[in-house]
Amino acid sequence: MKKIQISPSILSADFSQLGNEIKRLEEGGADMIHVDVMDGHFVPNLTIGPPVIKALRKQCSIKFDVHLMISPVHKYIEAYADAGADIITIHPEATDNLEESISKIKSLNKKVGVSLNPETKIDLINNYLEKIDLVLIMSVNPGFGGQKFMPEVLDKVKQLKEIKSKRNMNFDIEIDGGINFDNCQSAIEAGANILVSGTTVFESNNGDIKKNINLLKLK
């Protein structure tokens, strides 16, 4: 079994102190930083773009797990790669040609993630799993932080785990949306090995990031 990793979402950080917040996450033992990029078109919210990611990249050395909720996504992939993304995750619905977009990310020497919204079926990406490094299962409808976890998506996580085992694959299974101390164990048991968490990491236990990360890892 892969080791459990925590990818805190900076959507829940203090945006007036983003540089310091990134440093706090690194010092607190975060395995990577989850950066939610929203365009107000593919999802109903606006967040940050390449210049902010480029500035933040200078503040820490751990991986940037960049989740692109933008459409059309293909023409922006290179800009986020250049800004410092290590993993670039896209939605199948946001590109005209998923295979081309996957190849584009790989050509830039970045890890490829593909995200599935709660209603999106695994069948949509089944033929691409050999080329994917990470599958991100959304456990809320994307667009805003702080939403309630949708337990029904754990069936999808279990299905992916079975596919991985049957086809002897090695992609990561990441879960994002409403992850907290009450549901992290069920997410891990279902097969997720990367947990995205924002509010829980930044706000629980008086903001003790190290403690919160360890609790999410069931330590």
Summary of predicted features, one role per range:
Residues 178-190:
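Acidic, divalent-metal-coordinating active-site segment for phosphoryl/phosphodiester hydrolysis
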Residues 34, 174-175:
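Generic enzyme active-site microenvironment
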Residues 1-89, 93-97, 104-112, 124-132, ...:
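Conserved N-terminal beta1-alpha1 strand-loop-helix module at the mouth
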Residues 6, 175, 196-197:
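A structural signal for the hydrophobic beta-strands that form the central parallel beta-sheet
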Residues 111-115, 119:
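Internal catalytic-core helix/loop-beta-alpha segment
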Residues 140-142:
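Short glycine-rich anion-binding loops that position phosphate/pyrophosphate groups of nucleotides
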Residues 192-197, 201-203:
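Acidic, Mg2+-coordinating phosphoryl-transfer loop and its flanking beta/alpha structural elements
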